Swiss-Prot record:
This is GTP-dependent dephospho-CoA kinase. One of its GO terms (biological process) is coenzyme A biosynthetic process. It is an enzyme of class 2 (transferase). The keyword Ligase does not apply. GO terms for molecular function: GTP binding; kinase activity.
Length: 158
């Protein structure tokens, strides 16, 4: 289990990729993290391979996603943490070649971007929300995986 530190929280406030207000198409394997981001993609006809959701935005505002996912998994992940359960589930999901899956998080999904980048293959597109700015779109690369490893090392581990 990883616990967010102030140092890592400061780093995570900066987008890891380009920020978009709109996104109408994207190629290849797509992982969407966050409810508003997923809702935007689905409303534009983009069905992510995996959507990671907690059905809330800004920690407590409910978000309705009018979409029936093909396969749904659940995981517990408290705010400010990356739980062992979430890590194991993301590892498992990274091995499945399927589309339209959802990982429903009881707690908070924000930090799960880190294990997604760590475990999903290079060239996977990861899209997550940057509060009050838009959606961050990035491709997983070897360099990005190394950056994530460093951030995880800077978190408190239990």
């Amino acid at each position: 289990m990883y616990i967010l530190t102030d140092k890592v929280a400061t780093e995570l406030k900066k987008p890891f990729g380009k920020v978009y207000k709109e996104l109408n198409s994207i190629e290849g394997k797509v992982i969407s993290i966050g409810d508003v981001t997923t809702k935007h993609l689905l409303s534009n006809g983009i069905v992510p391979d995996l959507s990671i959701l907690d059905f809330k935005t800004k920690r407590n505002v409910p978000v309705e996603i009018p979409h029936k996912f093909k396969t749904v998994f659940e995981v517990y992940n408290p705010p400010g943490y990356i739980s062992d359960e979430a890590i194991e589930r993301i590892k498992y999901l990274s091995t499945i070649d399927d589309r339209d899956m959802a990982l429903i998080v009881k707690g908070e999904e924000d930090l799960l971007t880190l294990p997604v980048i760590k475990y999903f293959p290079e060239d996977t597109s990861v899209i997550y929300g940057q509060p009050d700015e838009g959606m961050v779109v990035l491709k997983i690369t070897k360099e990005l995986k190394q950056k994530i490893e460093k951030l995880l090392k800077d978190m408190e581990e239990r």
